[in-house]
Amino acid sequence: MKDIELFAFDLDGTLLDTAPDFLFAVNELRDNYNYDEADYDQVRSRVSQGAASLASYALNLENESPQKVEFHRQELLEIYESCCLLSTVIFDGVEYVLNQLNNQKIKWGIVTNKPRKFAEGIVEDKLGAFKPPFLICPDDVGARKPDPDGLLLALEVSNSKPSKSIYIGDHIIDIQAGEKARMITGAAAYGYIPINDNVMSWNSNHVFNEAKDIISLIAK
């Protein structure tokens, strides 16, 4: 399959390795409440599940009220805002993929659940050299994945057909959103897969064990 006209990507765990900065933020939050340092694998596996999941893990909030979780989620995000560019890097292979897309003038862009106040600066700092044609955040559509509205907007702004467009992400909600938008789906198995989850159970059209594997779908 090498006639894909649009490659849409998730951000955290797909294009960028943001887990080290989330680990820093989680440890700062835990330190504020006299907890020991967090387990990196636990943090990494939760990044794509969002800040509420990270805050719940950080302070053992699984059985607490939504209001308490939200309070500490905001605390975590305030810390993250100050450290979100410290250690975040591009995943191995992503630079090659994006260069190939740009060189061949194939449409691509980013659809993320990350709020724009964080995503915009991180994308500019880490991916600005690749000139992403679009960055779509929940703020833009009033919904988060697995709702497909972000992907539908991506299809609209890029003037792309769903049947010739792929969405690649590292969580089942990415695959669900892609399916709802009637797009081809790809699982980034190298990303932040939740512990005890199985990428193969997501039933995506493609599975990429490394970012460089995506190149197999790009026309030569």
Predicted feature locations:
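Metal-dependent phosphoesterase signature
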Residues: 57-96
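A short, structured active-site edge motif that brings together acidic residues
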Residues: 129-144
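Short acidic capping loops at alpha-helix termini that bridge into adjacent secondary structure
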Residues: 37-42, 67-68, 130-134, 162-166
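Short, acidic loop-to-helix structural element flanking the phosphoryl-transfer center
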Residues: 3, 81-110, 116, 120, ...
